[in-house]
Amino acid sequence: MGSAEDAVKEKLLWNVKKEVKQIMEEAVTRKFVHEDSSHIIALCGAVEACLLHQLRRRAAGFLRSDKMAALFTKVGKTCPVAEDICHKVQELQQQAEGRKPSGGSQEALRKQGSTGGKAPALSPQALKHIWVRTALMEKVLDRVVQYLAENCSKYYEKEALLADPVFGPILACLLVGPCALEYTKLKTADHYWTDPSADELVQRHRIRGPPNRQDSPAKRPALGIRKRHSSGSASEDRLAACAREYVESLHQNSRTRLLYGKNNVLVQPKEDMEAVPGYLSLHQSAENLTLKWTPNQLMNGTLGDSELEKSVYWDYALVVPFSQIVCIHCHQQKSGGTLVLVSQDGIQRPPLHFPQGGHLLSFLSCLENGLLPRGQLEPPLWTQQGKGKVFPKLRKRSSIRSIDVEELGVGRATDYVFRIIYPGHRHEHNAGDMIEMQGFGPSLTAWHLEPLCSQGSSCLSCSSSSSPYATPSHCSCIPDRLPLRLLCESMKRQIVSRAFYGWLAYCRHLSTVRTHLSALVHHNIIPPDRPPGASGGLTKDVWSKYQKDEKNYKELELLRQVYYGGVEHEIRKDVWPFLLGHYKFGMSKKEMEQVDTAVAARYQQVLAEWKACEVVVRQREREAHPATLTKFSSGSSIDSHVQRLVHRDSTISNDVFISVDDLEPSGPQDLEDSKPKREQEPGAGTPGIAAAEQQSVEFDSPDSGLPSSRNYSVASGIQSSLDEAQSVGFEDDGAGEDGSEGPATAAHTFPGPHDPGQETLAPASELEAGQELAAVCAAAYTIELLDTVALNLHRIDKDVQRCDRNYWYFTTSNLERLRDIMCSYVWEHLDMGYVQGMCDLLAPLLVILDNDQLAYSCFSHLMKRMGQNFPSGGAMDSHFANMRSLIQILDSELFELMHQNGDYTHFYFCYRWFLLDFKRELLYEDVFAVWEVIWAARRISSEHFVLFIALALVEAYREIIRDNNMDFTDIIKFFNERAERHDAQEILRIARDLVHKVQMLIDNK
């Protein structure tokens, strides 16, 4: 039962977190939050659910239906803030009910921001959550919730969320941010609509289909001048633009209001075909009222890439301005209702079949409201108390007399004819109507051409000529046409000159491409079809043949298959060590076993070293903890501690560590007398126990205020420890990283290597030996080294705890293995240390390889490339510069858009992509596929293939970015929402095409 209650409380709190995130994002992206925003209503609903959870009946009131009112009223007796909210809500309710409040109440409302002494009208949703909403608008909701959490015993049961010692304060803290925002009442142009989500933008783009892209820049531009509206490409672009505008108009935006929308409305476009379901919508703009109907096939994007089929369904779509409609025929049947629109020329539009459920009446009601105040329906709809709008009760006329249908018991009329009339413009077009009724339809065209005829030549000889293009030799109007001819000749010269200089700029552009982008790709193009079969990838059969006969299979051919088709999942465990450099292609099994043995011995040695150092670190924490509490309880060193925090390095994590400068030993010799006592299992460094210890005590780090004389580099600290202790060093073998040396800090021989397959903790005897060894070797560690190790252990523990916990593989035992591997790598690279994100790179390797030693070796090889992306390296700046060059050359239109909208051509939104090789952008299965292609591309096409994947991600959504005119904030929000929803195979295909395009540009073929 307890677990079920906890699950309910976690769900309630999670809903509040989600709504708080939404409202904070709106405040950042739109620079304001309107009081009528839907996010405010959603947040109030989530908070109200938390406040009502397990509320005592006495606090809620036995007979009151409004429990929130009872709660605030009861709390207001002892909480002044809640009492003020009660007064303000009472005033708002009086305004909503139409009763005029007192003068003092009007003054209070005027202070809230109402203008002219009139309070703004509240929507029904705002009235529903008026108590929580008012507290939020007054910026005191967090204080009210905090008061309820502190006095929960008066108002809540023991199982309530606010009675929980953890969840209650968390809820109050979550509301601090929304209570700090400024809410506006200003009616802005985009007040009635909110920015669509990434999913909705993608859905809109899918409806209208991908328009044609611009020509490839690899082709030399033609010097011919393309005539407007004469080529097929121009018409296709125009149709694509029309389709885009049509789809955007279906949604509510700043220009139009959506009055009505209903799906599955049937229309029969032709007599010989079945009715087609579609989406019917009614839109109101400043000038007109428009009805639109779109087939469901277009709305759902289920037509694929068949342009012919799409064009057919686009022909079925309806766009009907109501300024052209004079009457509406309505027919009611048991299966629903049918509506027929009749135009001014008497033509009937295709019938619209509404489903059952009163949808026809609902549409007419929205139409009548949209026609006001300039137009109206004749006869108007009736209003019936308790039901709202109803059809008018009319009498049917017979040839003999008027018969009341209802009196005869037959029932109400089922067929209606409504006229659309505009009382103020009734006789505006009478003249035109008379002409058309008399049969002079062509006179309308003549009326349109009249202004052109009036501007004709005044020369009688020209006007009397039989041909409009023939000019008599004796014509006197030739001087009038001479400036026009000179203008045409001048335009011709300008066009030719512009074409020439464009061609010259293009040639110079190609020269720039070859100069700056030649290093990004291999010049030798390796196609997928020579020999064929590379698109199928590296299969299990091909790999088994390679293992049987390594000599007849070339490494480049295997990598080509991986690059174009990936690796079959069953053999990834065997192939990845080759791709990462742990094994070399062509190695025999004996040579591979030798490499594995050397790596296992190396890993166990490093594991023993840092675990021995960890014992000293934990012992140092336990000794410093009591004295630290005493020091802070006295309050004597708080000011000095704050001063030391000012000198923290800003590049390190913002975690606050308690300073123990005054308690540190004066030198390593003081540590020799202190033997660490075994108070925990050797797994004390595991995430769970380490996290528990971190809550009780933290210690000083190199970036938490140490004196400047001790803030020298980590490498110098390690070297001093080596000199003092005369410790034993070791060199990297061939399987480890080239040129890297691990810090040898122990002065004695370390325990032997553990069993490579063992996942449990070491035996107690080995642990005791390691503890004694750590006590003996404590003098080998300088304070700087211990601080550095402790800081990195803290960061690793914090990151391991939250690393992909939703993925099935990462159980507690596997997280412990992940920590051991990461600590071993960081121990060998203390100059770099641990940086957030390294666990994300190690986790997929451990999932596939499922071997600690192998994952450690492969991760070390991977970090040779990825380590440069972290702050200690400089690869990130070069990535941004190369991305700028690539997109400027391959997609100049999108580059200009980025430059105009706040100049986000620095591509900082790609930082996480490059840092983690797109690990957080893709699902785990897609991460495997993308990573192996990146590794194979280093030999096949480009050592910088990550650039082309990043560019492919941008190109995949370029039309959405361009059509919505996204700025830097919008594009970050868009890609964050699209994380783990990308089509990885499509992204890889685009990336490979981009590489080939750059290769062709350089080769100029």
From Swiss-Prot:
Name by which UniProt lists this protein: Small G protein signaling modulator 2
SUPFAM superfamilies the record matches: RUN domain-like, Ypt/Rab-GAP domain of gyp1p
Role played: Possesses GTPase activator activity towards RAB32, RAB33B and RAB38. Regulates the trafficking of melanogenic enzymes TYR, TYRP1 and DCT/TYRP2 to melanosomes in melanocytes by inactivating RAB32 and RAB38. Inhibits RAB32 and RAB38 activation both directly by promoting their GTPase activity and indirectly by disrupting the RAB9A-HPS4 interaction which is required for RAB32/38 activation.
Organism encoding this protein: Mus musculus
Location(s) in or outside the cell: Cytoplasm; Melanosome
Cytoplasm is among the record's keywords: yes
Top-level taxon of origin: Eukaryota
Biased segments, Acidic residues type: 730-740
Pfam family, one: RUN
Listed PANTHER family: SMALL G PROTEIN SIGNALING MODULATOR 2, TBC1 DOMAIN FAMILY MEMBER GTPASE-ACTIVATING PROTEIN
Residue ranges constituting the Rab-GAP TBC domain according to the UniProt record: 566-938
InterPro entries assigned to the protein according to its UniProt record, in alphabetical order: Rab-GAP-TBC_dom, Rab-GAP_TBC_sf, Run_dom, Run_dom_sf, RUN_SGSM2, SGSM1/2, SGSM1/2_RBD
GO cellular component: melanosome
SMART domains (alphabetical): RUN, TBC
Chief localization: cytoplasm
